Regions:
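Pyridoxal 5′-phosphate
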Residues: 1-173
Length: 173
């Protein structure tokens, strides 16, 4: 990324030649990420950081379903997700924080019990950034799909380390 901070800092959306070259680089990066997680390139959106990506997912779930004001997440999410969830509570949302087992795993039965008719989103990291524990994303996503609830996973710690196939996981975002 360093060349894009120091010498290739143009606007990839611009109509001039320098911007066109950057567009090609950006498209190539989008293709690489899509290949890594078995997604379509058009499904890849770049943001400034993981926090922005996660907050955007929460916001999109709530704004597109204004009648749903409940979110389910875990007590061991990244600090930025916990902080945003607490902020959403101050704005009138209800947030259920699922506990983890002594070994750091999630009890999927508790997830099923936590989902309500007004649940807008379930958010769960794929791999814990502190313990390395892998959460059962395929199973959690299937539970959410069966209940008609959007499912978000922060997979940044898992990408490139475990196989991620967003087409098989039923992940919403």
């Amino acid at each position: 990324m360093m060349p894009y901070f120091t010498e290739n800092w143009g606007n990839p959306s611009a109509a001039y030649g320098f911007g066109n070259r950057l567009t090609k680089d950006l498209d190539a990066a989008r293709e690489q990420v899509a290949t890594l997680i078995n997604a379509e390139p058009r499904e890849i959106i770049f943001t400034s950081c993981g926090t922005e990506s996660n907050n955007s997912a929460f916001h999109a779930a709530l704004i597109t379903q204004p009648e749903k004001r409940h979110i389910v997440t875990t007590k061991v999410e990244h600090a930025a997700n916990i902080a945003y969830s607490e902020q959403l509570k101050k704005q009138g949302c209800e947030v259920t924080f699922l506990p983890v087992e002594p070994d750091g795993s999630i009890d999927l039965h508790l997830l099923e019990l936590a989902i309500r008719p007004d649940t807008a989103l379930v958010s769960m990291m794929w791999a814990n950034n502190e313990t390395g524990v892998l959460f059962p994303i395929y199973e959690a996503a299937a539970i959410c799909r069966s209940k008609g609830v959007l499912f978000h996973t922060d997979a940044v710690q898992a990408a490139g380390k475990v196989d991620i196939d967003v087409k098989l996981t039923e992940v919403s975002m």
